[in-house]
Every structure is written in C-alpha cells, then in structure tokens.
Amino acid sequence: PSTNETVEIGSKARIGNGLLTAALFQTDTDNEIVVDASSGGRTSYKNAGKTRRQGMELGLDQQFGESWRLKAAWTWLDATYRTNVCDDTSCKGNRIPGIARNMGYASFGYQPEKGWYAGSDIRYMSDIMANDENTAKAPSWTVVGLTTGYKWSYGKMDMDLFGRVDNLFDRSYAGSV
C-alpha cells in the first residue's frame, strides 16, 4: 500500500476587507503509484518507492468597496523522487513528471450580490517534466479568461446566468503529459 506522512503549518490574517493566507508543507510518500508508460490510450503504472512534495502556498482575497474583488494565489511545489525509479540511470532527486514547480492564479472583477457582474482572470503554470529521467518537458504557459453574468432571485431560488471565455488569446499549451 501507498502511505503518506504530511506536516503543514499555516497562518491566516485579516487585512481590512481581505484575507491573506500562507502555508508551508511537506509530504513524504512510500510506494507512490505513478505512471510507468502511456501509449495509444493505454497507461500502465508502477510503484515509485519514496517521493517527497514540499512547498508553500500564498493566497489573497481582497474586497474593494462593496462589489470589487481581487483574488490571487501562488504555489511553489518541489515534487521529487527520493529513490531510483529508472531502469538504466538514477532518477533519485529528479522532479516527478506532470507536476509544475510554480502555479499562479489571479482574478479581478465586479461582483455585486445581484445584477450584472464581470471579471477577468489569469492562470500560470511553469514547465512540467514529461519523463522520469527529466530529459523531456512541456513548456510553461499563461492563459487569460473572462466571465460575465447576471444574478437574480426568482421566488425562493437564486438564479445565475453566466458566460465564460477560457484562453481568451487562444494560446496553445500542454495541460498534462
């Protein structure tokens, strides 16, 4: 079986009409199940021995006036093999494929409780390794989105009609490997 040991410490602070959060964490896993090979729609798995994920998360949720809101989050994550999982070479210390080291998100919008609302957001993911040997990787990417909608009450029901455009500038990116 796969087992985990996790340690996390965090803090939250109210700043005016906002909330700032921060956390440090570390998870050590024994016998983690990871992808061995994936081809033609078929995927096989293997046990990776020991792995470690350690990092930090920062978040901000800030309200301006009655209806303007800014949200932001950043994660730094170091996910590595602690034992060798490769056949011919040593992969100990290599990054685990498919996991970005840095991920960020920010949004800003007009969000009243009722009526029209609108906002935009931006998402970032740093490069991700595509194999255990760390010889191939998918590049980092950034995409922008827009949201708009209308909120109202109909009897006892709250209604929300909305539309969203993801990847506004039609960027090509690899979402997974």
Locate the predicted segments by residue.
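Secondary-structure boundary/capping signal
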Residues: 17-19, 68, 116, 156
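Gram-negative outer-membrane beta-barrel transporters
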Residues: 26-28, 46-131
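Membrane-embedded beta-barrel scaffold of Gram-negative outer-membrane proteins
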Residues: 2-66, 75-83, 161, 166, ...
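Short alpha-helix boundary/capping motifs
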Residues: 37-39, 86-88, 136, 149
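Conserved C-terminal beta-signal and adjacent last beta-strands/turns
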Residues: 7, 63, 95-177
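Glycine-rich loops and low-complexity Gly/Arg-rich segments
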Residues: 3, 36, 45-49, 70, ...
